[in-house]
């Protein structure tokens, strides 16, 4: 009966207004929150979201970026444990699946700019009578992830209910996979050449104990005592009023000074993968390398964007210490770490804290701890005696997931080239160094800053291009060209320009075809390297600010020429008078002008001081705006000042 209900009943309610959502959910919380230590929830709108001050709590997720310096290999910056001691580290990663809809409802996933409580169905808000319908697309992405982790995918897996009460869980339980998960017994290899480990001796293989599907919770925001709010009366208009605000707009007030908790249900029910590692890691660097490689992998297969600063990838870390050769010690869990750097800091502090406690004849208690970002310390949240009894039980509204060998075969053959295989091929095919490969493969592993781009200034073609894979881009540019030359232009000019403008790596800023044409012009001597660098800077600036090409070079101008020309970059540079001056006839007016303005240098060159000729060359290059061939300019100057002076 339950199976038929799950397959036949579709939950397609329209998104709820703020008023109906409050009426629906508030009684549920009021029943339990009388006299409870849990903050009372409020459902809020976008104006409050912007002004909210987050409180450090084990249910609050805040974003943080990974700096480029964190990703560099080198000596460990974390102090080692005292001799004879070791840390044992396991990590639970919660990875939000990158799909259009949530795991069991038709609501779409929010973006960072989505107003609170506007992408919520009745099922997401736990309205009585609604039933779940499994998102098959999310299931496929989870299965692809399991295959890429070399996991064993079970032919049959089931969903369970994990019961606990908190304001960000309207139903009072989370749908997860406790007893029969989707997959287990996988592994990830951490290699020194990937650039995250201090030495080759740190290379390990980390086991993947389990990969399971589950729902995400709502997003909570917390306010300190002294910050209170009142509802705007306009937002309390009748729910049928089309002009009513989609979220309750709150304003600060001076009365009723209490702690407040505000809940945004947009994220509630989003599809998550919980990926549980084995306890093979021993150092913060190994833990950081593990999370970064997992992040790289889920991005490569399209399962998640893995942005820790936006909550798409969150980590809980289990840390214990013991003397080498003795049984593992009592573990402590550090919850909700939202950046790799914070996670590594937390592991280092927690392992040293436990060793110091044991050396002083103390006892490590099994407990859940939080991380203080301001001083890099961990703090107690609750002990084992306070841990909730989740009372897992099979979910009666969901049938088992059945996957055939044929389905798994199709998923396996649909996987893209995975990072390890890709790395090996780049070395063999192009002869790239590990350092160069790391630069290409790490593009996009830091902050994605798409939200900062003025997309209204980009043309339709640009908005349709969303590729951010630097390796694919490199291979397109390198086709028919020197791989090292292509790499140098990408890393030292294109990426440098993107970083200077605070832009993410997206191909449509400078399509590979156009960069390739520009490189060819430089190699053929038709454009100088100086001019080419200026061209790249102009193209990036035009893409960022929306120039139409009248005052500087623009991609729109290149694409317009591409409709009638096979070499639009050459044609545009020719139109703008930016081609190199490659003949003595073109250079003579500039050379003569420079010699007239530098008579002292001319006299010294004629006396045999040939080094001074470079001053004249510099003046010519300046007058030519970098378009002159410096070698030909030097030769022309020496010829003009007398054949006896020529080398």
Curated annotation (Swiss-Prot):
Regions of compositional bias (Low complexity) in chain numbering: 58-76
Compartments in which it is found: Mitochondrion
Alphabetically ordered keywords of this record: ATP-binding, Ligase, Mitochondrion, Nucleotide-binding, Protein biosynthesis, Transit peptide
GO BP terms, alphabetized: glutaminyl-tRNAGln biosynthesis via transamidation; mitochondrial translation
TM segment ranges: none
SUPFAM superfamilies membership: GatB/YqeY motif, Glutamine synthetase/guanido kinase
Taxonomy, superkingdom: Eukaryota
Entry GO CC: glutamyl-tRNA(Gln) amidotransferase complex; mitochondrion
Top enzyme category: ligase
Enzyme Commission designation: 6.3.5.-
GO function term, MF aspect, one: glutaminyl-tRNA synthase (glutamine-hydrolyzing) activity
InterPro entries recorded: Asn/Gln-tRNA_amidoTrfase_suB/E, Asn/Gln-tRNA_Trfase_suB/E_cat, Asn/Gln_amidotransferase, Asn/Gln_tRNA_amidoTrase-B-like, GatB, GatB_Yqey_C_2, Gln-tRNA_amidoTrfase_suB_CS, Gln_synth/guanido_kin_cat_dom
ATP-binding listed as a keyword: yes
Transit peptide: 1-16
Region (Disordered): 39-77
Catalytic activity as recorded in UniProt: L-glutamyl-tRNA(Gln) + L-glutamine + ATP + H2O = L-glutaminyl-tRNA(Gln) + L-glutamate + ADP + phosphate + H(+)
Xref: Gene3D superfamilies: 1.10.10.410
Protein family per UniProt: Belongs to the GatB/GatE family. GatB subfamily.
PANTHER family according to UniProt: GLUTAMYL-TRNA GLN AMIDOTRANSFERASE SUBUNIT B MITOCHONDRIAL AND PROKARYOTIC PET112-RELATED, GLUTAMYL-TRNA(GLN) AMIDOTRANSFERASE SUBUNIT B, MITOCHONDRIAL
Function: Allows the formation of correctly charged Gln-tRNA(Gln) through the transamidation of misacylated Glu-tRNA(Gln) in the mitochondria. The reaction takes place in the presence of glutamine and ATP through an activated gamma-phospho-Glu-tRNA(Gln).
Subunit details: Subunit of the heterotrimeric GatCAB amidotransferase (AdT) complex, composed of A, B and C subunits.
Protein name per UniProt: Glutamyl-tRNA(Gln) amidotransferase subunit B, mitochondrial
Lineage: Eukaryota, Fungi, Dikarya, Basidiomycota, Ustilaginomycotina
